[in-house]
Amino acid sequence: MFTKKSHADVKKSTAKLQDSKKDSASRLRHLRMILDNVELEESKCLFETNYSHVYFILYDTFIQAEANLKQKVHKAHREELDGSLWLLEKILCLLPELLARRWQCHSLSRIMAKLLHLGNSPKLRREGVRYFLLWYQTLGENAPGYVHAMYADLIPGLIVPQKGVVGPDTEFSASDFLTHPNMKADGGMASVFHDNAFSHPVQSSEVVALLPPSSSEKSAPPDPRDGLEVLLNSMVHTAACLRWRDNRAQKDHRAFAFLLQRFMDVFLPVFSPNFDVSCSIYNPRLDLPVMRSINKKEEVMASCVVVLINWVSRFTHERLLSHRLDCTLHIEDVDQVRLHGYQQGLIVRDVLYVNRENINFVHEVYRQAFLLNFTSKPQIEAIRTAIAVYRDWMTGETPPPFLLEPNDDPPPPSNAGGTPRSQRLRTPSYVGAIAGSKDQLVVRAGRQNVLQVFVTNAANVFLVNTANLNICFPTRSRSYRSTPLEEQTEICKKVLNVYRTMVMNTEMDTRTWEQLLMVLLQVTSIVLHQNQHTLPSGTNKSATLGGILGSAIFQTLIVTWIRAHTKVPVNVLLWEKFLNVLQSLTHREELIIEWNKTIQTLTRVFSRYTYGINLLDLPLDRVAESRAEKRRRIGSVWQGSGSNSAANGGSAASAAISQNRQRESLAESSSSRSEETSSQVPLPNHPRPHHQHTQSQGGTGHGTRPIPLTPMLSRSYSEGSLASAARSSRIRRRRAATPKPKALQPSQLAENRINPQDLRRAMSLDSLARKGDAEETDSYQEGDNESGAGSRSPSPTASSGIEGGSIKDAQLQIDASLDDANSGSYGSGSNSGSISGRRCIILGGSAEGWHPDSTSIMWKRMLGALGDVNRIPKADLHAQVFMHLLEMTQNLIKIKQNQGISTDNQNTQPMPPLVPPIGIVAPWCYGSLSLDRSFKKGKLWALQLLCSLAIQGAVNMQQLPLFYHALHQLLTGEDRDLIYAILKHLEGPRLLSLLLPGHTLLLLDLVHASAILLTSLEVSRSTPRAEVAALLGSLLCYPSSLLTRSVLQPTPQKFELMECSDLQDHILNIVLRCARREPSAKARCIALSQLGQWLLMRLSQPLPASNSGRANLFQQAVPHHKDVHPKASSVYNPRIKEVLQVLLQALQFKHHTIAIVAVDSLKLCAERGRQLAAIERVPQLIITAICKALEIQSVTKPKDSDKVVLTSLMLCLGEFCMAIPAPIMLTPFNEQGDTLVLQVLRVLLQVASGAPRHERVKLTADDDFDMHIAHDDLQGDGRLPEATYQTSETIQKCITAIKLCAKAVSMHLVTHIGHFPMGIGASRLSSMVEEQDDIGNAAYGGQVETRRDSVELPSVVSAQNMQLFMLNSGLVASFIELPTLKLPGGGITAGLVTADKQVRVLMRDLNGKACWDASILYSEPRNAEEPPKTTPKIQHSQPLDSMATSMVTHTPSPRHTLRHRPAGVLPLAKDMAPDLDQLDDMLAYIGHTSPECVAPTVSQLNAPTASPLSGNQEAQAISVILNQRLLEQEFVTHSTQAPSPALRHASSNSSLQQPDQRSLHSTTASFDSLPTRTEMPFQYCRLLFSHLGLAGWERRSRTHLLQRSEKLMRELRNVDLQKCRETHKMAVIYVAAGQEDKGSILRNTSGSSTYEMFVSALGWEIDLETHNGFLGGLPRQGCGATAPYYATPFLEVVYHVATRMPSDSSEAMLLKTRHLGNDEVHIVWSEHNRDYRRDILPTEFCDVLIVVYPLRNGLFRVTVNRKPEVPWFGPLANESVVSGACLATLIRATAINASRTKRAALPLYQQFYEERNRSLDSVSSRYKESTTFEDFASRIYNPMPLSTLGTLRESNASSSAAPLASALLDHNRASVKGWVQASIDSGPIMGIAPSASAGSTAAMEAATGMSSASPRGPRKLGAPFKSVTKKHSLQHIAVGGGAGAGGDTPPESPTLPQRRFK
């Protein structure tokens, strides 16, 4: 499109250019045209050929333009000047060779002077500076002096002092002019260049401004900053502009180097007088910076320094150059201007890097940046720039040449941005000029020197005080202006972050590490001290740099310190300085906070590397959790500490490692530390692409072992001195000294190397899966990539600078920097064995990273970094330190507790040889106790720490005197807070169970302090009232033989012994007062429980033990028989009554938990009822008090908690009534003759009836007993059931339950008082007899035998010798007539004349089931020898009348044979005679003597009234009766003479349903079996029923028949299964020494002798196969042969003893585990040296865990661990010390109360009597049969007539085809009155006409006969009575299993199964 002109045109223009006749303007125009149409080389040739013409044109046009501009400034004139300047630039650029020889030097200097005039416009002057620099660099060193002077004036306002005499060639002197040959003419002094008017040469005109500034341009005074900026920019713009003929690139660089050198020589000393040219990075001077002040004079030129810094950073900042290169190379048609600009930048950078002087200049410029004073915004930005440059140098991929090591090969060619450079930008000549010589190696200073220089120089930003500067800087937010302090703070944060980047990511040598440490120490010391002392005391922390950055500075210092010791050996003198600095700054809270973070993190690493335990993922926290299995499948790094058992790489291993790291990274971060997944030095908001650093691999990858830097730098601190712990512990064991190891000194560690195999070394995450040297590098690189892309490796700092706010959120990732800590170098060798032999750096070896020895040493050193913590001046910081020490100690305790934990819970691991130094800080604790009162808070923490050490057994024999002395002084001192702290943290009785040598010396001190606390009114959660009560309670029940009489005298200043024989009496007084007036609920409960224990012990041991040997080590109170009485000579403690009265008074407490605890404590004594009876009036006191408490606790609207209290009281009352001997209960105790039984029944009746009291019951008067609780600290525990609100329904439920309990207790007492246990034993309260027992012999003559455990009982349903009654709503009676049973010796009727049948009555009620066998008694043995003569006759003609059966004697005389007295004679008793009727005579006497009493219609009182019937009617009735009598006599005679089948009439024709042949056969057989008796099968039962008065009309409303059916029998079986007592089942587990896993514990088949004694004392052994009581779900076979069992009249307990159950197979182990795991209460006997844990036998149950630990002194430590939802219970509290005499009793009572409390807390839980009552109600509501009196009487006469029997048989026969729905719909329908049909059928035979009523009933039955029985389908429902295989005493049978028995098996009840408790 555009073309240049032809060659001919160029020639024409050239000719015109050379034509001197043309005007200069035309020639200039032709010259421009020529240059526009030729190449640059041709242009240069043109200029060189016509240089004279060209310069003439320049000068002429310039002079013309100057002249025109002087006249008037016009646009055309400015254009003329622009053309001249264009030509000037062309001459300067194209003729450098001529100009270098000073061609036209003077002329050009005049032009330049005019252009540089200060009066010119700024634009023109900038152009002039550029032209001058082009000319000046061309002249170079050949420039004359005046040119150099012109250069010195380039910056206006900057005065450059003249440096002495100017050189001889710079100017011409006057003499030179005069002596010059040209100045002389012929014979005279005249000259053309000489003015004759004057005597001197011609002078040049004055230089004036060419183009003054316009009015729009400001005429401000010149600013040196602007001039310097113009100069520096022009230096860059003029670079590479000269077109040299040869060696252009070299000359370009030389030209710029000249300008730069001139700049440094001329201007730099002027505006930066502090610029130190002697500073060198090749031999750096590393003097530590000091505090500096702000000099106002220096601030004047600071802006110029800022300009220089910004200018240098443009060419040394890698990122800026990369940006230019990227922009240039991505454009195809590169613009020459842009390309030229890029070349200029490269030239500048190359010149800056070309030699050492220039490189030093660059670093000195940046040093000046760090010395700026934050007084302006540009200064702040310059500092930021300097920091960014150094950061990019350290992290960039292409380092500058001075960063390269002098001996290393140059790095592979690559540019900063990652894009290959174009080769055309680097010509061969350029490469040869710059990098082709050995000079390039000279500039290499090495990375370490640069790092040292930066570390030293950058510290200057901290060392200037800007807090007093009253300056504000604008920000992006218009509403906020920042201050110099804020800006300095941000800059310091950036420097700290760069320091951290170096620590984390940069390889540094020893000198660099030490310099960094020294600089940080200097900064820490100066900044924090300076801010502390120069500001007023009340200054806010945010007003000082140290206050803002104190935490960050301390953290950086500490982390760098620890990191350095894992990388390089550090001079010991630095440690001393470090300690001095930290100790001098202990008044700063930031130091304490960071020190604590360091210690806590070091403790984690210490735990991980030394003991193989991750504190953030403890083994105890993982046990018994499902997630633990997943973690174990992934693999725990810490378990194979010295092995090489990890997976061999691969993706699975990498994924596992990544997951572990991510979990640890998240877990170890705290709220104050932000964990970032990609950066361990967090720099938020500026993400940087991830780079893999070759330096992080150690700088090389050629055969050497790579040292992982970047990915390994993210671990946490660790704690230590444990390499020595193993060795020292072995030494102590050899010397038989205390087993607690102590850390050795580092010198000892260095001298005595331990065996590497003894250390449990933990391999790092990145050192997994390495087998040999061949795989080493790849494995590491995999680890690096994993770490970099994952979560734990620190990335480089962000690309665009560090955010100022990152420090606060970052905290240097102290966990990360120490937790990883190059541990890979520890496990990165060819195998673990080779690595374990290497010594760590801190011990003088070469192994980097964390090792057990390095972690232990570093942990101990950092622990002591603060020096003596008791010298901390501030009390609050002193307390804070001890609080942190306590946290650290608790972590050490966790480590100890988690050592040797089995991961699979199948085998117990041996204890490791290393033990954490728990007591390492004990000396500090003792020292703190001697401080003054202002340090009280710290002393409290120290006391807690000491007590924790004592509890953990970390107080050795050497420390015990100090420990006792400290406790003695504090316990007897005046400071109650310290006293309370000791009592609280000694954990009450835990101190007694520790068995510390000589601990009994402190008993009186403890009692004294406890009395002070309990008598105080201070009630809060921090006051240890409960712990003190438990301690005193344990001492109260302490065996006197173990209490030494010598104790310390309770005075603070004395340490003397005294005798105290009455210590326990003193304790008893305190406990009694606590039980009476304690304001804390929990302490009151504990005191009451301890009083109960004391009572039990005193009743069990009435006399003190005469011998104190081991004979009394373990005495148990085994339950004894009721006939065993205590010795009469027993003497009981006289204070038993006083203690009893306190317990009885507590029964009236309205606080429900306290009342229940009092009940439980009192119930302990119920087992000692006979001992209590031996004490005068104690039984009356107890019974009366309980009855009174019942009345007081009764409320009109009870809640669930009231119900629990009242039921507990009533059951306790029942227990005492059963325990106290019956004679005492039946003995009157007052004048009215009331007995205790009467009083009890009266109260129970009142409760059961719910009768309101007419008078208010008042509490028992006791002025010393406080019924109020000021502090209910039981709120946090589980609560008794309590509804949020009450409704009438909930109130009624509670009332019903309370009444039912009273009824059950009263019935129990009526039945069992004086009889328990009966002959069957204590395991059975109810009869085991059932309806089917002995029926087979009675009904079938022995042909068919029914079995007890059979559910298929059709014979029971159809038996005619049995009837079921409901005598009232809660009483079901079964009357069964049986043949007289043959008993050994004749039984109770031996020798008496009885009938050959007996009556069995089974009664089921709330109290259980009772069985009574009754026989009719005819005569005594003497009468039986002479039987009456009428006996044979009666036997053959005995009527069916039930009353006649008893007439075995002569009938009395008839009524009319009696004599009568005269009417006026008074019948007296002395005149009685057998034939006189006293009542008849009395009536006659009254009527005779008092006629007014005789009615008008009656003549006398003893005469009958007139009959309402007529005489005929009376005669008719008499006739019917006589006929009936005659018929009966004939029937008897007929049946006796002809013994035919009695029920022959059943086969007669009838319209009713006929019975089947089976029923006829069974009925016939039943009568044939009685050949000697012909009475009905139910005859004697009917007789007894009448004798008992049950047949009377007055009882008709309460007595009902029950519908006989199989469902009823099942319901009765269900009633029998309901327990009549409270039942509990508990697990008993034995843990032998060395057992801590489930497998070994469950495999125990026996225990120690003490354990066996304990188990035997819990109850008595029962045989599971023959036991007839509660079994707790144990099968009779398969779970052992015996089990311990215990029973009282109101409860049963069975123990699932693990050692009794077999464990020889996996099935047996599974069964054992199920039985034990399903128990709610576990009793564990542990002889292991560590505490038993719940997770050893994991289960969803085990709500309460009771563990017994035998102690060496014969006592037992008991811990009670309950789940949070379980309410408080007694008598044993957690951490109790109990003697062996009452151990089993207390454990049993505690376990029972625990089970009872757990159940009471369950919603909708019902007691045993409620369950039984519900079953009885179910029977009465479902099966009660409403009948008329006639029907009722008939069913008594004949329980099962043939009609009913047939109907029942037919319904059973047809049941197989009927659906279940019919049974569900019709099961409540009334049965057919079959007995009516039987009487009708028997009418013709008997000769009796059926009555009308009987006929109508029969007709009704006939009409409904076919539909009366509801058919039932064959489906069976799962019910509690489902047929199962059961063990019978004679043989083992299976019911309902065969096919043949299917027809006789009745269907199961369609009702749903009821809930059962076993």
UniProtKB/Swiss-Prot annotation:
Q: Single GO cellular component annotation?
A: cytoplasm
Name the UniProt key words of this record, in alphabetical order: GTPase activation, Phosphoprotein
Residues recorded with modification Phosphothreonine = T1945
User: The organism sits in which domain of life?
Assistant: Eukaryota
**Statement: the UniProt record of this protein carries the keyword Zinc-finger:** no
Q: Which SUPFAM superfamilies match?
A: ARM repeat, Rap/Ran-GAP
The Rap-GAP domain extends over 1612-1819
Residues with Phosphotyrosine modification: Y980
Instruction: Indicate yes or no for the key word tRNA-binding.
Output: no
Q: Name one GO molecular function term.
A: GTPase activator activity
Report biased composition (Polar residues) as residue ranges: 788-800, 1546-1568
Residue ranges with Low complexity bias: 640-656
Q: What's one GO BP annotation on this UniProt entry?
A: regulation of small GTPase mediated signal transduction
Entry-annotated residues carrying Phosphoserine: S718, S764, S767, S787, S791, S793, S795, S1551, S1949
Composition bias (Acidic residues) maps to: 775-785
Q: Where is the composition biased (Pro residues)?
A: 400-414
Q: Where is the composition biased (Basic and acidic residues)?
A: 758-774
Q: Where is this region: Disordered?
A: 1-21, 400-424, 635-804, 1534-1568, 1903-1958
Q: What is this protein called?
A: Probable Rho GTPase-activating protein CG5521
State the organism named in the record. Drosophila melanogaster (Fruit fly)
Phylogenetic classification of the source organism: Eukaryota, Metazoa, Ecdysozoa, Arthropoda, Hexapoda
